[in-house]
Amino acid sequence: MPSSDTSRPCKRCKTENAPFSLRQDPTCGDCYVQYVAGKMNKRLGALHKDIRVSRLPTHRRYLAGLSFGPSSSVLAQLLDETAYRHSIKKSSSPFEPIIVHVDTDLSSQGGESPARKLLDEYRQRFPHATFECVPLTDVLSVKSIDWSTLPLDAGTPDEDPAARLRRLFDALPTVTSRADILRQLVRHLLLHMALERPCSALLLGHSTTALAALTLSEVANGRGFAVPLSVADGMTTVCKYETTPDGAVQETSRLEFPVYYPLREIFRNEMLQYIDLMPSLKEVVPSNEADATANVVSHKDMSIEEVMARYFQSVEDGYSGIVANVVRTTGKLDRSQGNSFCGSCGMSLDAEGDSRWAGEIGDDSGHGSGSGGLGRLCYGCKRSIHG
């Protein structure tokens, strides 16, 4: 953010009249930009070190999610810049970022969607990355979800897939449930695309602030056991399911795939300041996304995830250390991998923990589909899907 005292020199390069404040230090615009880019490059370097299997230069193809929000837009711009730097260095290994936006609009409007039009602007401004827009309906072909655990009807071959997903969301009990399941479906679809390409890793553009909000919303939703798996960098288990001839669903395979958050060490307000310093980003990031915290609304019709996001966005200026500590503490927790995984969110099942969460609700039989398939769901997904 702009500093109240512009007469002090930049803490990093000693340039006079540093107009910005970065981690309480006076900073010039160039150093501000370098700081944000350096944080992402550091995380990408750690990722490459974690997953490389040879000392020889290897092709790095990363798939990154794009929501059109500030953080994911900054990630797209920085990946485009990194791809350009690698392209002009003959000795550098190929670097190929694939930026994917999942269009969650399930309306039946014809013509080109607003998301595709906006993505065209991203393509023009960031030509060194590949941009794709995929409809949320593509998730219906994803095998990493046990669809028998969700209230999704069988449908007919010629039925509109969007209509089936609309009925699924209409069957969910609360706003929080719909936001929770939507986030899961988007994550499953991005993982599916990253595996199909194939890519080296899936990159998600969460800031420190967003990860803190995700941490507490996951705990509030009943997935405290799996928070280290869903928030920390590292390998995630992807299970594949198939329906047998007799109608039962069984797991057919599982593999490990890296999911990383390259912007995890940058606060949301720092992203917004970075966007103001980058004309290519300022022109393309929707202003309503950048000013999302300006509107004060009732929490009555908001999901837990939205409430947590607004809370951390409102306190990060005065209590940035607390926000960062939430994320750092989560990163230090053990990533305990279980033998069983939730058929909906894909996180490890903790039988004892689920029992403690459930309290007097009682045990489920764990057989059948729909409400009868509760045994394949973690406690958080049981509550999201069935109330």
What are these model-predicted stretches?
Residues M1, C10, S303-G387:
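Cys/His-clustered metal-coordination modules, chiefly Zn-binding fingers
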Residues P2-R23, D30, L211, I266-A324, ...:
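Mid-to-C-terminal catalytic subdomains of enzymes
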Residues S3-G234, S384:
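ATP-dependent adenylation/nucleotidyltransferase module used to activate substrates
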Residues R55, P161-D180, T244-E256, G366-L374:
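Intrinsically disordered, low-complexity acidic Ser/Thr-rich regulatory segments
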Residues S67, S71, L182, L263, ...:
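Catalytic cores of large soluble enzymes that bind and process phosphate-bearing ligands
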Residues S92-P97, S253-P258, D301-I304, S369-L377:
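Glycine-rich, flexible loop segments associated with nucleotide phosphate handling
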Residues A210-A213, S217-E305:
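Catalytic subdomain that performs nucleotidyl-dependent activation
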